[in-house]
C-alpha cells in the first residue's frame, strides 16, 4: 500500500491510550493501525514497533513515547502510546504529547486496577477533555453478567473523578483477536469492535479548538524602545490573532494595564496582524520601557487574569534525570518557570504527604511571591538556580 497522503482537509485530533499495565494499550494501538491500514487509511505498525518507543527529552525529562498516525473517514489522528506507567505520568504532566482525548483501556478479565484509577485522575487534573473506553480481552470473559459488572465499575470510577460516567461510550472486544485477523471488515466479529471504537472516538471526542481561534495571548520575551516610535514587546504568539489598533492588556507581575497596538512587525516587515505561532514585535501606545517586562503577557482584555495561589500536579525528576538527590518537604521554596520567567513559590504538600521523593508525582498547593497570568492547564517547570528539578501543570486556580 502506498503511504497515505496527509490530508489537510480533515480535522486533526491528538489522542492517546491510557490504562493499567498489561491491559492491552499497545496491542490496541497496533490493532487500530492495522484495521485502518486494511481500510486504506493508515500504515500498519506492529506491536514491537510501538513497544520499543524511543526516549525523548521534554524540558529535561526523559520520556519514552510511541507516536503513530492514522485516519478515519472523517478525521486525521496522531496517537501516543507509552510503554511504562512512569512515562504516562510524565507525558500527561509535561503536556509533551498534547491529548485532545483518550482511549481508556480496561481488561474485562481484571476490571479497573490502581493505574486505571491514577490515569483517570491525571486525565482529570491535566484537562484531557473527553475519553472513550475499550473493554479489552472480552474473549476471556464468557459470563455476560461479569462483563456488565466490569462496565458498571468503570462507569462508577469515571463518575467519581467528574467524568460523565453514564454517557461515556464503552466498547468491548479483543485487541489481540483483531490484530490476529486484520481484515478490517465491518461484518468481521474480531475487527468490528475496533471499527465501532473508532466510530465512537470520531463522534464522542470533540474537535479541539485551534490555537488561532482562542483569545490573543503573547508571552513577553523581550522589551526595547525605538526612539520616536515607542516601546516594542517581542515574543511568540501563543494563541489568537492581534491586529493593529486592537486594545490589549498587559497582565502579570504588576497591576494589569490597558494599551493599544500601534504596529505589528515580523522579520523587520510591518504587518496588519500577527497570529498563533508567529514571532513578532508589538508596538504599544503610551507604554514606557520600564512599564513592561519579560514574564508578563499581552492578552485580549478580560481573557486572562493574574494569580498567586493555585493547585498543581507535578512530577519531580529523578537523580538520573538531573534532578534532586534528596526529597523535599512542606514549605519547599523553588522557582516556578512560567512561559518566559521564574517566580519563587512556596509549596504546601497535600494532606498526608510527609515528603516528595525524586521520581514521585505529587499534588501540591503553591503560593507565588509575584502574580502570574494563568489559567487551569498552564504548564510550568520547577527550578532550583536555573536547573530543572520538576515539571507541573496548574489543576486549579485559587486566588
UniProtKB/Swiss-Prot annotation:
One of its GO terms (molecular function) is translation elongation factor activity. It is an enzyme of class 3 (hydrolase). Mg(2+) binds at residue 26. Residues 19-26 are annotated as: G1. Residues 10-209 form the tr-type G domain. It is found in: Cytoplasm. Residues 174-176 are annotated as: G5. Disulfide bonds: none annotated. It catalyses: GTP + H2O = GDP + phosphate + H(+). One of its GO terms (cellular component) is cytosol. Its main location: cytoplasm. Keywords: Cytoplasm, Elongation factor, GTP-binding, Hydrolase, Magnesium, Metal-binding, Nucleotide-binding, Protein biosynthesis. Residues 136-139 are annotated as: G4. Its EC number is 3.6.5.3. Residues 60-64 are annotated as: G2. Residues 81-84 are annotated as: G3. CDD domains: EF_Tu (cd01884), EFTU_II (cd03697), EFTU_III (cd03707). GTP binds at residues 19-26, 81-85, 136-139. GTP hydrolase that promotes the GTP-dependent binding of aminoacyl-tRNA to the A-site of ribosomes during protein biosynthesis. Belongs to the TRAFAC class translation factor GTPase superfamily. Classic translation factor GTPase family. EF-Tu/EF-1A subfamily. Monomer. This is Elongation factor Tu 1. It comes from Syntrophotalea carbinolica (strain DSM 2380 / NBRC 103641 / GraBd1). The lineage of its organism: Bacteria, Pseudomonadati, Thermodesulfobacteriota, Desulfuromonadia, Desulfuromonadales.
Amino acid at each position: 500500500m502506498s503511504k497515505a497522503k496527509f490530508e489537510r482537509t480533515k480535522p486533526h485530533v491528538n489522542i492517546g491510550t491510557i490504562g493499567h499495565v498489561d491491559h492491552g494499550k499497545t496491542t490496541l494501538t497496533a490493532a487500530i493501525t492495522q484495521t485502518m491500514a486494511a481500510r486504506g487509511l493508515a500504515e500498519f505498525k506492529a506491536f514491537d514497533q510501538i513497544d520499543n518507543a524511543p526516549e525523548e527529552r521534554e524540558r529535561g525529562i526523559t520520556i519514552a513515547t510511541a507516536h503513530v498516525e492514522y485516519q478515519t473517514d472523517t478525521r486525521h489522528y496522531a496517537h501516543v502510546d507509552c510503554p511504562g506507567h512512569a512515562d504516562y505520568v510524565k507525558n500527561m504532566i509535561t503536556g509533551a504529547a498534547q491529548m485532545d482525548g483518550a482511549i481508556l483501556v480496561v481488561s474485562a478479565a481484571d476490571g479497573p486496577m490502581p493505574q486505571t484509577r491514577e490515569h483517570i485522575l491525571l486525565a482529570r487534573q491535566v484537562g484531557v477533555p473527553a475519553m472513550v473506553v475499550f473493554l479489552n480481552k472480552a474473549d476471556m470473559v464468557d459470563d455476560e453478567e461479569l462483563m456488565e459488572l466490569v462496565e458498571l465499575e468503570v462507569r462508577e470510577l469515571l463518575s467519581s473523578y467528574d467524568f460523565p460516567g453514564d454517557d461515556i461510550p464503552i466498547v468491548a472486544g479483543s485487541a489481540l483477536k483483531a490484530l490476529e485477523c486484520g481484515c478490517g471488515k465491518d461484518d468481521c466479529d474480531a475487527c468490528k469492535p475496533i471499527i465501532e471504537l473508532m466510530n465512537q472516538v470520531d463522534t464522542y471526542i470533540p474537535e479541539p479548538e485551534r490555537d488561532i481561534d482562542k483569545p490573543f495571548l503573547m508571552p513577553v520575551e523581550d522589551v526595547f524602545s525605538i526612539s520616536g516610535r515607542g516601546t516594542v514587546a517581542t515574543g511568540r504568539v501563543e494563541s489568537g490573532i492581534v491586529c493593529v489598533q486592537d486594545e490589549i492588556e498587559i497582565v502579570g507581575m504588576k497591576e494589569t494595564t490597558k494599551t493599544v497596538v500601534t504596529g505589528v512587525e515580523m522579520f523587520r516587515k510591518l504587518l496588519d496582524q500577527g497570529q498563533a505561532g508567529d514571532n513578532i514585535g508589538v508596538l504599544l501606545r503610551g507604554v514606557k520601557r520600564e512599564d513592561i517586562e519579560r514574564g508578563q503577557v499581552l492578552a485580549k482584555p478580560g481573557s486572562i487574569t493574574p494569580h498567586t495561589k493555585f493547585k498543581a500536579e507535578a512530577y519531580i525528576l529523578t537523580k538520573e534525570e538531573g534532578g534532586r538527590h534528596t526529597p523535599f518537604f512542606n514549605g519547599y521554596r523553588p522557582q516556578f518557570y512560567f512561559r518566559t520567567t521564574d517566580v519563587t513559590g512556596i509549596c504546601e504538600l497535600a494532606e498526608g504527604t510527609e515528603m516528595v521523593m525524586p521520581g514521585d508525582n505529587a499534588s501540591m498547593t503553591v503560593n507565588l511571591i509575584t502574580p502570574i497570568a494563568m489559567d487551569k492547564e498552564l504548564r510550568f517547570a520547577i527550578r532550583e538556580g536555573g536547573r530543572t528539578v520538576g515539571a507541573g501543570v496548574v489543576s486549579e486556580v485559587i486566588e
